[in-house]
């Protein structure tokens, strides 16, 4: 579950009396998806966050500053913190030690009745008991009262009473668990990068806490990363702007509380055109925004317009900037902590508390206004950037109209080069974005015209990382894609209007093809990101080689496969190898059989797992700072496959 700023009312009184019991654990193993979302790889990793979040509660309450997560042999997980240790005295209602109640009873925790944590997003103890129920084995060690207490469980059932196993001069809690393979049938193997990304994010969002991740599964190659950011989300913004050119050296930073709502905001403008706004409530990434984002945007637009007019940078009232104009080239993070967060939206990642809007608006507007008046040169640059964005917006409006279709049935306005499919059901429809007209011809002949549409792209599309929306919308290839997809773009984007649920990038297997693929992915990431988040974007995998032996043909997709095939084939009859450099070299039948036929093809689905890394990668590869790109090329040249 989520965690937030915690305030334990009285250190001495944090004991069993404050752990309240609501209900039993029986349902968890029967319907695990209700408690952790799914039993897939994502649900498996969710177990780790349930335990880590409890440790973060302790840290934010001021009782811990170190958390360690270890992936042990056989994919055991160990989470250690140096907090006070879970209470071990007898819980009155259950007549059992509080630590056992927390680990075996659903909705038992220190967040009910006001006696434990004052502010917390999750229900402290819910996570622990759910993890216990879904674990093959779980062990707890509590360092408290100069004593080490220990208890072990199998599938949530205690194997013996809580016992004393030693003395200690430390305090804290250690929980070890192994996920139950009967529940997690897809996998019980943890992904280091998945854990690393969230742990880094938690370290940014909770400044001053040190969180360490260690992987001990391979004794020869133990991997460890430790994260500790005294600057918190200010450091986060600086990292996101690392490959950009900031307009002002230091991010604007505010960290204040009002009406028991803690507000932390960091914002820094750069010379680019993309907006990067990340919002969090009680450490949960609110992908769908919410009232904290609304309050911030409202204050930002109002204050910039007020400053622009009063300082005469903007001449008249009609020159007012829109919200979109004020956010061009802005990197910002909003993090709030609330005692009772209400989450809404399709994925429960939208903050709904109405009182938050006014609090964020008031705190941020006061601070931002003061910053502008104290830094007039930076203020002028930001306002003038907004004015340029407004002009581009007006110019883009006309171009945007060209890409708009009245409805999904408005076939007349579809691009002329598009060979559309006959099905009108988006769930089964796919569109192939094909490099070059000649390959486009082959794919049109070889496709299944009922469900497969083809849009040939001539040449390289515009690098959107270096362009404003008006210029982007004047690019013919981009305009055709927007019209064909039917979703709109930027602020007008509507995923529900997507005409295809598979958008397949199909380029040549050479350097030019890779460049076009990167340009397309940059466009999707910056202007149609929900397509990626919904899992609609794919990359086709055309074969690299055709190996012929007598009448037998083999299509091979990479060098490793080729080496394996060559080692397995008889030397007679003699075989020959042809390398495909372009899609146009294959006829329609070959393209269908190797790359487009759903029965045989291989597609790579584009996923967005680490927003920080994705943003930095696109900026580094496609942005203005040459030095970082040169360094990347030098570091990775050894892995390159060059075509001469």
Curated annotation (Swiss-Prot):
It is found in: Cytoplasm. Pyrazolthiazoles inhibit the ATPase activity of GyrB. Keywords: Antibiotic resistance, ATP-binding, Cytoplasm, DNA-binding, Isomerase, Magnesium, Metal-binding, Nucleotide-binding, Topoisomerase. GO terms for molecular function: ATP binding; DNA binding; DNA negative supercoiling activity; metal ion binding. Its cofactor is Mg(2+); Mn(2+); Ca(2+). The keyword Lipid biosynthesis does not apply. Its main location: cytoplasm. SMART domains: HATPase_c, TOP2c. InterPro entries: DNA_gyrase_B_C (IPR002288), GyrB (IPR011557), HATPase_C_sf (IPR036890), Ribosomal_Su5_D2-typ_SF (IPR020568), Ribsml_uS5_D2-typ_fold_subgr (IPR014721), Topo_IIA (IPR001241), Topo_IIA-like_dom_sf (IPR013760), Topo_IIA_B (IPR000565). The keyword Cell membrane does not apply. Signal peptide: none annotated. Its EC number is 5.6.2.2. One of its GO terms (cellular component) is cytoplasm. Mg(2+) 1 binds at residues 435, 508. Residues 429-543 form the Toprim domain. The record marks 460, 463 as: Interaction with DNA. It catalyses: ATP-dependent breakage, passage and rejoining of double-stranded DNA. Belongs to the type II topoisomerase GyrB family. A type II topoisomerase that negatively supercoils closed circular double-stranded (ds) DNA in an ATP-dependent manner to modulate DNA topology and maintain chromosomes in an underwound state. Negative supercoiling favors strand separation, and DNA replication, transcription, recombination and repair, all of which involve strand separation. Also able to catalyze the interconversion of other topological isomers of dsDNA rings, including catenanes and knotted rings. Type II topoisomerases break and join 2 DNA strands simultaneously in an ATP-dependent manner. Heterotetramer, composed of two GyrA and two GyrB chains. In the heterotetramer, GyrA contains the active site tyrosine that forms a transient covalent intermediate with DNA, while GyrB binds cofactors and catalyzes ATP hydrolysis. This is DNA gyrase subunit B. The lineage of its organism: Bacteria, Bacillati, Bacillota, Bacilli, Bacillales.
